[in-house]
Amino acid sequence: MKLIIFTGLALLLIVSLIDVEAQNEGACLPRGSVCTTNHAGCCSKLGCDCYRRFEKGVEKGQKCWCIPTGLRYSKEKE
């Protein structure tokens, strides 16, 4: 009887873990999506990178995107 209960609980645990993992995979932001600074929203191997925007020397806020970790964009010299 104990074996049946233990087996049932083990199966329930496995099914619960699989369901949680599937929900977490669908909730991430793909590459190029707008994100916030909390890095948790981007999919794996992506980071939330933020850049300050300026127009005519005046700061116009900050934009953040999910981009590959370690990738850096720079302004092209004119």
Curated annotation (Swiss-Prot):
- Name its species: Lycosa singoriensis (Wolf spider)
Q: Which GO terms describe its molecular function?
A: toxin activity
Q: Post-translation: what modifications?
A: Contains 4 disulfide bonds.
Keyword Signal recorded: yes
Gene Ontology cellular component annotations, sorted alphabetically: extracellular region
Going by the entry's taxonomy, the superkingdom of the source organism is recorded as Eukaryota
Where does this polypeptide localize? Secreted
Query: InterPro entries recorded for this chain?
Result: Spider_toxin_CSTX_knottin
UniProt keyword annotations, A-Z? Disulfide bond, Secreted, Signal, Toxin
The organs and tissues expressing this protein are described as: Expressed by the venom gland.
Q: Which Pfam families match?
A: Toxin_35 (PF10530)
Name assigned to this protein: U7-lycotoxin-Ls1d
Membership in a protein family? Belongs to the neurotoxin 19 (CSTX) family. 07 (U7-Lctx) subfamily.
Keyword set includes Disulfide bond: yes
Signal peptide segment? 1-22
User: Where does this chain mainly localize?
Assistant: secreted
Q: Which residues form the propeptide?
A: 23-26
